[in-house]
Amino acid sequence: ALAGTIIAGASLTFKILDEV
């Protein structure tokens, strides 16, 4: 479960960085 949260967080961060 923790790994999934980390992956989701990393994916979200990457999406935000890509949007900038």
Swiss-Prot record:
Residues 1-10 are annotated as: Plays an important role in the hemolytic activity. Keywords: Cytolysis, Ion transport, Membrane, Nematocyst, Secreted, Target cell membrane, Target membrane, Toxin, Transmembrane, Transport. It comes from the Eukaryota. GO terms for biological process: killing of cells of another organism; monoatomic ion transport. It is found in: Secreted; Nematocyst; Target cell membrane. One of its GO terms (cellular component) is extracellular region. Residues 9-20 are annotated as: N-terminal region. GO terms for molecular function: toxin activity. Pore-forming protein that forms cations-selective hydrophilic pores of around 1 nm and causes cytolysis. Pore formation is a multi-step process that involves specific recognition of membrane sphingomyelin (but neither cholesterol nor phosphatidylcholine) using aromatic rich region and adjacent phosphocholine (POC) binding site, firm binding to the membrane (mainly driven by hydrophobic interactions) accompanied by the transfer of the N-terminal region to the lipid-water interface and finally pore formation after oligomerization of monomers. Octamer or nonamer in membranes. Monomer in the soluble state. Composed of a long N-terminal alpha-helix and a core region rich in beta-sheet structures. Before the pore formation, the alpha-helix binds the lipid membrane, partitions into the lipid-water interface and stabilizes the monomeric molecule on the membrane. Finally, it traverses the bilayer, thus forming the transmembrane pore. Belongs to the actinoporin family. Sea anemone subfamily. Hemolytic activity is 3.6 x 10(4) HU/mg. This is Magnificalysin I.
